């Protein structure tokens, strides 16, 4: 049963939040005013201050906020309810009695970490699956700043020696191992960035009788589905990749005749 997803980047739990039943959320004080979330008769949600609708979506949730009495701000997770873009974020602020909202921002993922510290709101999409993260900052002084990249880094102390610890992990977690990450980059060359886009829904990885760690992913959110199969050979210090778009022939790295026998058997049954 394939139940977990990294996409769209990379978004684990990507479609979980917006489809939950809408629940009452407490009002929040911002700069002497009250931010309220209300549900309409059409089962949409509105964020309102003094009756003014500042944001309306299928789903709205307050992630974090701050208030110093004279001014304050809150960051909201918002979603139109579709699977193509599980969520974005909006900052609503009150200063000198005036309430304003930013345009929605984010990466179309609802897995950001939101925090407020000393009047600065940070919305961080952490690096995952070989992809860089994205960090947004908002403040009264600067408003919403352009996003900054947070480079992906493998976990310290990881190598071929502990690659077997990847068994039971999800396919995209293979890139948390420094040696495995380097091997995929060396194998794929300019196709590495494309490769990271193929991580979608997947099960925890297992190992073949030969000890090759194997995992697969698929993404059926678009018109043309994609499939990914990866193999990791800790003994031979090699990696293997198969990528497929829709009904097209898969692209294999390296050529199939160089794949271990047990992994070639996996290819015969893939995609499922």
Region spans (language model):
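N-terminal signal peptide c-region/cleavage motif recognized by signal peptidases
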Residues: 16-18
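Acidic, small-residue rich beta-repeat scaffolds with periodic aromatic anchors
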Residues: 22-37, 94-193, 229-272
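Short beta-strand elements that form the blades of beta-propeller/WD-repeat-like
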Residues: 29-38, 70-86, 117-129, 212-217
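N-terminal, post-signal-peptide region of Sec/Tat-exported proteins
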Residues: 39-78, 178-198
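Structural motif
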Residues: 43-45, 80-92, 130-137, 225-227, ...
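Mid-chain, structured segments of secreted extracytoplasmic proteins
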Residues: 60-99, 217-221
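Structural signature of eukaryotic scaffold interfaces centered on beta-propeller domains
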Residues: 65-70, 114-117, 205-207, 268-271
């Amino acid at each position: 049963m394939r139940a977990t997803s990294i996409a769209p980047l990379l978004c684990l739990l990507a479609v979980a939040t917006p489809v939950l039943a809408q629940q009452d959320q407490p009002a929040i004080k911002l700069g002497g005013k009250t931010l309220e979330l209300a549900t309409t008769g059409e089962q949409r949600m509105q964020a309102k201050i003094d009756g003014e609708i500042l944001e309306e979506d299928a789903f709205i949730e307050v992630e974090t906020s701050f208030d110093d009495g004279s001014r304050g701000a809150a960051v909201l997770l918002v979603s139109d309810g579709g699977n193509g873009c599980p969520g974005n974020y909006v900052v609503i602020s009150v200063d000198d009695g005036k309430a304003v909202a930013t345009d929605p921002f984010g990466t179309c993922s609802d897995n950001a970490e939101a925090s407020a510290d000393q009047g600065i709101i940070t919305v961080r999409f952490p690096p995952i699956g070989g992809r860089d993260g994205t960090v947004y900052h908002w403040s009264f002084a600067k408003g919403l700043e352009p996003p900054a990249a947070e480079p992906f880094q493998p976990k310290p102390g990881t190598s071929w020696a502990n690659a077997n610890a990847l068994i039971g992990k999800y396919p995209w977690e293979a890139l948390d191992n420094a040696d495995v990450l380097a091997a995929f980059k060396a194998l794929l060359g300019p196709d590495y960035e494309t490769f990271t886009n193929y991580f979608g829904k997947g099960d925890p990885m297992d190992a073949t009788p030969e000890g090759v760690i194997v995992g697969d992913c698929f993404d059926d959110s678009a018109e043309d589905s994609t499939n990914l199969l990866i193999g990791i050979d800790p003994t031979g210090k090699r990696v293997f990749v198969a990528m497929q778009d829709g009904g097209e022939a898969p692209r294999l790295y390296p050529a199939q005749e160089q794949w271990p026998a047990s992994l070639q058997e996996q290819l015969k049954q893939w995609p499922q």
